[in-house]
Amino acid sequence: MSSKSSLELANNAVKSNDIEKAIDLYKEVLNKGVSKDEKVANEQEQALTNLSDLYVRENRHNDLAQLVQQSRPLMANFSKAKSAKIVRTLIDKFSGEKKSLPLQIEVANDCIKWAIKEKRTFLRQALETKLISLYYDNSSYTDAINLINTLLSELKRMDDKMLLTEVHLLESKVYHAIRNIPKARASLTAAKTSANAVYCPPMLQGNLDLQSGILHADDMDFKTAYSYFYEAYEGFTSLDDDKKALSSLKYMLLSQIMLNSVSEVKSLLTGKHAIRYAGRDIEAMRAIAQAHENRSLADFEKALQDYKPELASDPIIRSHLSSLYDNLLEQNLLRVVEPFSRVEVSHIAELIGLSTVQVEGKLSQMILDKIFYGILDQGSGCLIVYDEPQQDKTYEAALEVIKNMGTVVDLLIENKASALL
């Protein structure tokens, strides 16, 4: 049986859902060993790709990890650049689920050791860049920063602009995750500087735009953030990366909601963008936009509850919705409290549909922040509201007169002293 026929039979077995037979046939192709025949090498590459896809489809992550290890002898069939691409592709095949990350990190570390042994510097650097990304996804930020520092010093000596761009971008994302915003900005600037010196692939440019938008949103500059998110969305859409395009679209909607641009939000929700990515994620943002427009805490909380997986899973969305909820709660409390000089906290809670504990906590914070003036009487369970104290201008005027008189007296003393001399 020739390698070609084995590959064809394996593909047919996949189509007929005979999984075990397909796996055996793909392995038969791979077990032919190292060959200088280009045709055989191409068939082995195809078998490797198809078998890895099959393992992914069947959620057989351990088998995929073994395949990565067992395929190393075949790398002699390919150029160093091609073998590096194959190894990275195989690691990327793992599911993006959180539970598969430890195995993926283990496989990446194992491949790095192999690359060091084989003295494949370019492959090792590419794998270390991938490992940083995995550490970031796994929230192993200390490990990520340690590896970033080591890799950056090496890449700067080699002046590899492309990898420098990728690593600086990852550095920005890691620092943003640990809320070191100044370093996140500095890293992003470094990434853009490196990117300007070389051709920047659309995917990398999209990721740079996305990170730029996220940092501008953190500065509450949602107008600029929207522009970057739109650029990222256009880039990811052209690459058919639906997952990242959808995230960018959600951030675009979030920016317009935070800007209180009702017409822009409605335009986005009814336009071609929302139609293409219609689903629960877009409906979640629609519900948030509607609740914000109506200034309704009840609708806002209902949206957060009904679309919890879509809204809570994204830390960027979650962070800004928390800020939006706080602002909405403050506005509702101010509107309710305004007519009263003394009111029971339980009555306020009943009017806005929240628990007494929640309302009391928020009122305390607002008083401390001087959003309004008052005290909480714990004994009676009441909020006592005061008028904003007016500063008496007399004291300021008196202090100014005393200051001027002091200046005049000092000058008189100086003049008298000069005359005596």
Curated annotation (Swiss-Prot):
Xref: PROSITE patterns: PCI
One Gene Ontology term, aspect cellular component: cytosol
Record key words, sorted: Proteasome
UniProt xrefs under SUPFAM superfamilies: Winged helix' DNA-binding domain
Zinc among keywords: no
Pfam families, per database record: PCI (PF01399), RPN6_C_helix (PF18503), RPN6_N (PF18055)
The keyword Transmembrane appears for this protein: no
Gene Ontology terms: biological process: proteasome-mediated ubiquitin-dependent protein catabolic process; ubiquitin-dependent protein catabolic process
GO molecular function: structural molecule activity
Positions of the PCI domain: 221-390
Highest taxon above the source species: Eukaryota
Membership in a protein family: Belongs to the proteasome subunit S9 family.
PANTHER family with a match to the protein in the record: 26S PROTEASOME NON-ATPASE REGULATORY SUBUNIT 11/COP9 SIGNALOSOME COMPLEX SUBUNIT 2
Quaternary structure and partners: Component of the lid subcomplex of the 19S proteasome regulatory particle complex (also named PA700 complex). The 26S proteasome consists of a 20S proteasome core and two 19S regulatory subunits.
Function recorded in the entry: Component of the lid subcomplex of the 26S proteasome, a multiprotein complex involved in the ATP-dependent degradation of ubiquitinated proteins. In the complex, rpn6 is required for proteasome assembly.
Protein name: Probable 26S proteasome regulatory subunit rpn6
Protein species of origin: Schizosaccharomyces pombe (strain 972 / ATCC 24843) (Fission yeast)
Phylogenetic classification of the source organism: Eukaryota, Fungi, Dikarya, Ascomycota, Taphrinomycotina
Gene transcribed to yield this protein: rpn6
